[in-house]
């Protein structure tokens, strides 16, 4: 998984 704005792969799923 790619890192999102929060710098977390799991967080990416929440943001995106």
UniProtKB/Swiss-Prot annotation:
Domain of life assignment: Eukaryota
Keywords: Pathogenesis-related protein, Plant defense
GO biological process: defense response
Membership in a protein family: Belongs to the BetVI family.
Protein name: Disease resistance response protein
Species of provenance: Pseudotsuga menziesii
């Amino acid at each position: 998984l790619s890192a999102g704005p929060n710098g977390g792969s799991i967080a990416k799923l929440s943001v995106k």
